[in-house]
């Protein structure tokens, strides 16, 4: 069977789809599927995979890129039996008007909401955005993301919460399927932080992701300003890049935290492993997450979790059973002082910390095993 996969980001890009697509393409190829990927890219790269990767330059005239992408999907989708859409949804739908192929869509978020936050057009929570009215630009974007989803034969989401959201876009329940994200489970036990020996240990926090408005990295940095009043030896690793990088670095400098907050830039999955291994606490302050793969990775490396209870994150934290929760103020972002208090509580609660870490590890093995969950996708295509 021939399968065409479309995606907006692909390695060396960083993000959920960029991590997922190579894995599912590899699995499909190993099971005798003929796979072609069409993706956007910042520069041409020679790919040496057993599947075909067709890259389209991202930074060019938008109309020209759209036309080129649509024609590329038509060309490579002509002999395909299935189009698996992980990005480029409108281009894929327009191409499929002519192709009339089975179309499976994976939805991991709401690009209309992300666009509104990135452009500073809105300052509201993900869930509020779904029901509120907005300007014409955003209403068109909301219509587009929902309408293209309804045209798919099946829509897969990585969380029950997101499945409910997509159902409200107009996709019928019998077309929806939840397949959780997963991580490769391995024995990666690291030395836990011992607060009794703080004089010789540095407590390392880490947060990973795109430096975008809804990630609320500014709140995490502000909480570090409070933390240093009680803890001397600590560092925060901010892994990733994005539109707010310059602003966040300026904030760090103004707070005098340049020696405490380390911006690493984008890192490969192999490079990221070392940061996980050398950290003790993972902090997520996002206003929304579909189902964050980084939380699963953090569990795999025995990090204690602090997270906002948003989207699919609560399906990982399970109302505080597997980590600590920090509430959002007005549904948008946490309060930095509240976050700093929770961090101190985590450090001073060894028994509770160990119990939650154990619970999280058990959940990872039963619900978020990457190998098991990828096989669920394989079953979809085999059917």
Sequence positions of predicted segments:
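Short alpha-helical donor nucleotide-sugar binding micro-motif in glycosyltransferases
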Residues: 77, 149, 266-267, 274-279
């Amino acid at each position: 069977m021939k399968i065409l996969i479309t995606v907006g980001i692909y390695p060396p890009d960083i993000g959920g789809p960029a991590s997922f697509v190579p894995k599912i393409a590899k699995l499909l190829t190993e099971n005798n599927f003929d796979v072609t990927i069409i993706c956007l890219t910042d520069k041409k790269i020679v790919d040496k995979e057993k599947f075909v990767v067709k890259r389209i330059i991202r930074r060019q005239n938008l109309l020209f890129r759209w036309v080129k992408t649509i024609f590329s999907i038509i060309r490579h989708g002509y002999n395909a039996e299935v189009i698996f859409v992980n990005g480029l949804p409108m281009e894929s739908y327009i191409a499929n008007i002519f192709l009339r192929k089975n179309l499976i869509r994976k939805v991991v978020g709401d690009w209309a909401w992300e666009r509104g936050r990135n452009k500073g057009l809105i300052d509201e929570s993900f869930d509020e955005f779904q029901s509120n009215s907005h300007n014409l630009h955003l209403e068109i974007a909301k219509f587009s993301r929902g309408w293209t989803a309804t045209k798919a034969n099946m829509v897969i989401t990585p969380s029950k919460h997101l499945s409910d959201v997509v159902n409200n876009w107009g996709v019928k329940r019998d077309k929806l399927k939840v397949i959780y994200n997963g991580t490769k489970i391995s024995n990666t036990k690291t030395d836990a932080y011992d607060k009794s020996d703080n004089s010789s240990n540095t407590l390392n926090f880490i947060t990973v992701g795109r430096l975008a408005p809804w990630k609320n990295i500014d709140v995490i940095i502000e909480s570090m300003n409070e933390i240093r009043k009680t803890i001397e030896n600590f560092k925060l690793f901010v892994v990733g890049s994005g539109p707010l990088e310059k602003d966040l670095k300026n904030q760090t400098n103004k707070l005098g935290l340049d020696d405490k907050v380390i911006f690493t830039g984008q890192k490969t999955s192999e490079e990221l492993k070392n940061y996980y291994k050398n950290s003790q606490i993972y902090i997520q302050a996002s206003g929304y997450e579909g189902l964050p793969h980084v939380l699963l990775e953090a569990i795999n490396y025995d990090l204690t979790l602090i997270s906002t209870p948003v989207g699919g994150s609560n399906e990982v934290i399970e109302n505080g059973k597997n980590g600590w929760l920090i509430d959002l103020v007005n549904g948008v972002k946490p309060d930095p002082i509240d976050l700093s208090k929770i961090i101190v509580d985590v450090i001073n609660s060894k028994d509770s910390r160990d119990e939650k870490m154990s619970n999280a590890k058990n959940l990872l093995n039963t619900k978020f095993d990457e190998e098991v969950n990828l096989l669920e996708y394989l079953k979809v295509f085999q059917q």
